[in-house]
Amino acid sequence: LKEFKLKNINSFPSIITTAILFINLLLINIPLLKTFNYEYSVANSILLFLASGLLTIWKNNSYNNASFLQVIKSIKNYLIVFCFIPFAIGLMSSLFFSICPVWNGLVFYFIITIPAAFFGIVTGKFICVIFEKFRYLIFLISFLFILFIPVAEFYFNPQLFFFNPIFGYFSGTIYDEEISVSFLLISYRLLNIIFFTLLAFVSDFLLTKKRITKNIFLFIVLVFTLIFVLIKPALHYSTTYSSLIKNLGKSLTTEHSVIFYSNKIKDEKQIKLMGMMHDYFYEQVKDELKQKSNRKIISFIFFDEEEKRKLFGSAKANVSKPWLNQIYIDFNSYTRALKHEMVHTLASEFGATLFKINKNFNPSVVEGLAMAIENNFDDYPVHYAAKIAYDSGIRVQLKKLFNGINFFSNYSTISYVYAGSFFRYLIDNYGIEKVKQFYKNSDFNTSFKKNIDDLGNEYFRFLSKLNIKKNPDKAKLYFGGKTIFKKICPRSAAEETKRAMNYYKKGNFSQSEKLFSKIYNYAETYESLSGLINSLMKLNKNLEAEKFLSREIKKFKGSSYFYNLELTLSDVYLINHKIESAEKLLDSLIAQNPHIEYVNHALIRKMMIRNDVEKLKVFFRMKSIDKINYLMDLNQKDIHYFTVPYILELSKTDNAKLKSVVNYFKDKLKVNDFFSCYAGFKLSNAALVIGDYNTAKEFAVKTLSYKDDEFFYKTLVNNLKFINWVNNLE
């Protein structure tokens, strides 16, 4: 093959310049890329690495023995234009068409994008020195190899985050909105700069050397690159199986699982329960999927979201890697997420491709099966949540949902619930074997002998006939959020909110007030509004907090955050001696009934208003232990079941206190309505945590006397099944 000589095309730099201009004009019309931010900088780092490398080869072909600095001087004007175009377009887009702050974008651009252009030049020059033919092809192969190294790390390593010479850093999922310039990113970029600077000197050194010398240095460069890849885990730029096990520090082996968990998790009874829950869910999922394998699942349990972010990459998302037979969950959410992630892992036995999932990598199929087998959304079967959405007018087109990556076009709970409910319908009506076949081949006609339209019509007829009381406020609570693509300045807001929260936790309320106010002015997020109001209250600016919140709360009507804000506003009214306004708001919240937890909190406040308004004002500032004692005192004469879940929530970090609370209510619980049933359900869960399995069973049995809610009754039955299984195991 004869190399295509781009050096003879004098307009080549103009072509690249035009391409950069055109691509950036397209980028600013794409969600998450339309402002000067992290994603915009990453996209342009890839573009400028490629452009600067190609330009270097084009120029070097005309001046074959030119030094690195000579090449830089000859193309410096083009390079300035290359780097300026994205900078100018991104900056103008942010300044004239957005209210987002540009500071973060500037920092990312100079730490991620500008170095990438330099690395492209060095790579292009080094290739010109080492190779005499096929330079463009070799550069493109090198570019793709460097760019897609993270695919290998993602596949083989227990991690989601990536450090890469071209795009710097990627956190792994879209669910973590906060991405900031960390010390790790800066140190990684400095090492990149050192390496590519040395490579530039090596290129100059090799200009007049013989072929054998060049080959030796090429080998040395490749060896150094390999060494760096191997030591990345020690530098915290990647995570391997062994490094993750070492960092977590503890392990537990059960019949069906090998669990590696954080050494910060100390409670032996909770660790024991964690192991039993792994085996119970394993057997449940295996039976429903009709699987025969007895292979052990490897589970990594992180102490909290922050540890998960540091070691694994994703703080918010719990993840399974079916092809590795591994699950990654934080301790605070494992009871909710474990069964779901276990479905992903066990489904690998009938999955397709190297990733052991759906053939087309369709997230609606992958998550739909997991939701259907888990069949628990906020302690209700998944059909319940789907019906709540359906009756409230929150609907999806299944044909669209199961096409490509449209799963991510909706707020996440909408996609998860509908995909899960639809799969649950398919399992119940067509059998698990046909669903497993579809999971593998993604062909409705082959698996079910019907197309998606016919199956969708069947499913929605089924859903419409379910007898569930319509509750639009519950629908808003469940489904009233926004995807990251529809939020205003999500990256900047998340990063600044984290800083503001740090000020708040350190007691610097003046600074937190200023920063939360700034964030709310451009992003109008719930987190910034809540933080601002709480900061104002800490500064005793209660009237200002009331005025601001009563005006701004209207903007959140219809969102999942509205009910939290109603509670907060009622508290502000109470502090400002506006009892009538507070009671009116609490009555409204009870009537809306978005969730029993909100109703419980409203009833607690109404009871305390009747008893002692001044004590209630003090209650808001009490420590957890004092709140527990005060609420327990209120239960001495009569049991107020609406207080029990909150008492248990306050007690969860103190096992001794939790045990005393459980024992106090042990002989007093009488289930006669939903409030007492829900309290009993929470008490049975708490008894499990402290290792009192007999008491857990007593509470669970009592809850079954409440049968007015057939969907919640299924949850109560499942709760008792698990507790019986634990007791039998003991």
Residue ranges with predicted function:
Residues 39-40, 244-362, 373, 380-381, ...:
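Juxtacatalytic substrate-recognition/specificity segment
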Residues 21-60:
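Long, hydrophobic alpha-helical segments
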Residues 30-40, 85-108, 140-188:
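Membrane-interfacial interhelical loops
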Residues 143-146, 185, 314-315, 337, ...:
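Acidic/His/Gly-enriched intrinsically disordered linker/tail segments
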Residues 61, 68-93, 467-469:
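Selective transmembrane-helix segments that form parts of the transport pathway or gating/packing helices
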Residues 188-220:
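Cytosolic-side transmembrane helix boundary signature
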Residues 135-149, 215-223, 439:
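Central hydrophobic cores of alpha-helical transmembrane segments
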Residues 153-162, 167-175, 179-180, 219-231, ...:
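Beta/coil-rich, acidic/histidine-enriched accessory regions frequently appended to metallopeptidases
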